[in-house]
Amino acid sequence: MATRNRTLLFRKYRNSLRSVRAPMGSSSSSTLTEHNSLTGAKSGLGPVIEMASTSLLNPNRSYAPVSTEDPGNSSRGTITVGLPPDWVDVSEEISVYIQRARTKMAELGKAHAKALMPSFGDGKEDQHQIETLTQEVTFLLKKSEKQLQRLSAAGPSEDSNVRKNVQRSLATDLQNLSMELRKKQSTYLKRLRLQKEDGADLEMNLNGSRYKAEDDDFDDMVFSEHQMSKIKKSEEISIEREKEIQQVVESVSELAQIMKDLSALVIDQGTIVDRIDYNIQNVASTVDDGLKQLQKAERTQRQGGMVMCASVLVILCFIMLVLLILKEILL
């Protein structure tokens, strides 16, 4: 069952409550009202913490209100706090999975280097560690892929563009991580096969020495038995290497399936850049058209009938004023 840690959110609400209640009374009454508001006591003194319909991404977005009802004066000292949408939690969870996968991949690289080093032991512990780390990384990648599909399946909303950008970014990071793991596994597989070929050459040399030693004296039989023990040990190592190679091949196949699923979610960065350039060009052309329309409207306003009428009226008023002055002078 999936759970979410709300300790930080609780502390945020508690600190907000303290800052609001501090100027309203003494420290003792503030502590009492804080306890009553958080525990739901019927005191009527504490404020109500209410999750109202506000958003961190869009102030016009509405969410389901969650409030603690106080039977007393609940309208006094109300604190309004907005909650982010659900897909933000999903994206944060995917980011945590990707970070854990990166850490495990670093440990896996060290385990690969340690397992490929020549040693006198059987290497079962290193192989078990490699197998465990590979399974953990693959599990984290699959879980991230499922959460990413859940994020892409979210319905349309007012912040869908932000959600799509976050989805593309996480999908790109997940694809790069899968490619890196696939490359590590392929390199490890090649080096294992190379060591296997070297072991086969060593076995052939030991077999030749054993056949040659059969014609020697009885004193050389002890050395021949020692060679036989080496051959058996080499055969056991070859069998273990075969198992390791098979496990690596299976993990590479799983990674190939993950890459195939991610290819449907990742959008090429060049396409995004082209889309941005296209939008910028559209904005530039729209601004140019708007400027032309404004200039045309200005010319039309200057040469319109209203301007002509106003000009004629001003001229007539001036003529009438002159005639009035002349009339007064002559009479």
From Swiss-Prot:
Q: Which residues form a coiled coil?
A: 124-154
Residue ranges occupied by any t-SNARE coiled-coil homology domain in the UniProt entry:
235-297
- Fetch the PROSITE patterns from UniProt: SYNTAXIN, T_SNARE
The alphabetical list of record keywords is: Coiled coil, Golgi apparatus, Membrane, Plant defense, Protein transport, Transmembrane, Transmembrane helix, Transport
**Gene (UniProt):** SYP43
- Residue ranges under compositional bias (Polar residues)? 31-40
Q: Highest taxon of the source?
A: Eukaryota
Q: Give residue spans on the Cytoplasmic membrane side.
A: 1-305
Q: How does it assemble?
A: Part of the t-SNARE complex.
Where is the signal peptide, in residue numbers? none
Task: Describe the function of this protein.
Answer: Contributes to the regulation of secretory and vacuolar transport pathways in the post-Golgi network, and to the maintenance of the Golgi apparatus and trans-Golgi network (TGN) morphologies. Vesicle trafficking protein that functions in the secretory pathway and mediates liposome fusion. Required for extracellular resistance responses to a fungal pathogen. Also involved in the protection of chloroplasts from salicylic acid-dependent biotic stress.
| Topology of this chain in the membrane | Single-pass type IV membrane protein
- State the phenotype upon gene disruption: The double mutant syp42 syp43 exhibits severe pleiotropic defects, including short roots, a large number of lateral roots, semi dwarfism and early senescence. Plants lacking the three genes SYP41 SYP42 and SYP43 are seedling lethals.
Q: Which organism is it from?
A: Arabidopsis thaliana
Family as reported in the entry's similarity comment: Belongs to the syntaxin family.
Vesicular topology: which positions? 327-331
Q: Which GO terms describe its molecular function?
A: SNAP receptor activity
Q: In which tissues is it expressed?
A: Expressed at low levels in roots, stems, flowers and leaves.
Q: What name does the UniProt record give this protein?
A: Syntaxin-43
Which compartments does it reside in?
Golgi apparatus, trans-Golgi network membrane
Where are the stretches annotated Disordered? Answer: 20-45, 59-80
Its GO biological process annotations read:
chloroplast organization; defense response to fungus; Golgi organization; Golgi to plasma membrane protein transport; Golgi to vacuole transport; intracellular protein transport; protein secretion; salicylic acid mediated signaling pathway
Q: Which GO terms describe its cellular component?
A: endosome; Golgi apparatus; membrane; trans-Golgi network
Which residues span the membrane?
Answer: 306-326
